[in-house]
Amino acid sequence: MKKRALVCGAGGFIGGHLVTHLKNEGFWVRGVDLKYNEYAPTDADDFAVGDLREQDFVRSIIDQKFDEVYQLAADMGGAGYIFTGENDADIMHNSALINLNVLEACYKRNIKHVYYSSSACMYPEHNQLDPDNPNCVESSAYPANPDSEYGWEKLFSERLYLAFNRNYGMSCRVGRYHNIFGPLGTWQGGKEKAPAAMCRKVAMCPDGGEIEVWGDGKQTRSFLYIDECIDATIRIMRSDILEPINIGSEEMIAINDLAKMAIDISGKNISIRNIPGPEGVRGRNSDNTLIRDYLSWAPSQPLRVGMEKAYKWISAQVEIEAKNII
């Protein structure tokens, strides 16, 4: 009999890739989201469109004992969405409600194996002030002081899943994602992450033109390609690791240098102009010590390789949109 998996947030970037991976493993997969993925048809055997904030809907889709449940659904976006302050209440309310509903429904169905996608945004701001030496080791999460309400909600929900482990005998797993990117992800509209934003700006910019980058461009981040993320997610889900664990790359890069990488990939001659704008913490980089020790896992490719794939896909999307406008 086929194993059965549920992917919440299956219409999103990571969720869509995860559905495909699970199908390739031979799972029967149900996906659920507010919408279908706008860039590719779903590979799910069953796809339910609905609102995970609604308890009755959640109960209707968690109607059996799934072997694995992946809870990736959240109200999220890039710096332009998270750090303005205008979306704080929605972000906290919507994501917390989704997690409460999904986890309770899983518990009532006696589902043990639930994966929760947390984020590096839950790390304390005071440990990420130095762009050259950020501290994002898992044990540095407390004393807590995330730089956004998005991060605070992630921290709350981590504790929620771990509390269900302790009190109700569940086997929830928590992965802290560090800036996942790649094809089939949001690339415009304000919710895109930095790699997609840079690829879009460069793809749309004429040769000899100029792109804008928020802040001084010296803020640092690390970025993980989607295929690597899915591999680590599956490994953590099926491991005995009880604590939250980083899923990211240790290849740190300044945002200006990320823009320069996209420019170099394009082959264009483009200049960069730094402008005021939301930029988040000064430095953030995944510390992969735990996942390396526990699972012998590390990214298999450098950032440049993933950026080349992302640029190719986003450049094609820009061309398609331009043709549709004409």
Predicted regions and their residues:
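N-terminal Rossmann NAD(P)H-binding glycine-rich loop of SDR-like oxidoreductase domains
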Residues: 5-25
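Conserved glycine-rich Rossmann-like NAD(P)H-binding loop of the short-chain dehydrogenase/reductase
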Residues: 27-36
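Rossmann-fold cofactor-recognition segment
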Residues: 43-54
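NAD(P)H-binding glycine-rich loop region in Rossmannoid oxidoreductase-like domains
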Residues: 52-95, 108
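Conserved Rossmann-fold NAD(P)-dependent oxidoreductase catalytic core, especially the SDR/UDP-sugar
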Residues: 100-147
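NAD(P)-dependent short-chain dehydrogenase/reductase
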Residues: 126-135, 159-237, 250-252, 259-266
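Active-site helix of classical SDR
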Residues: 149, 153
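C-terminal substrate-binding subdomain of Rossmann-fold SDR/epimerase-dehydratase oxidoreductases
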Residues: 204-326
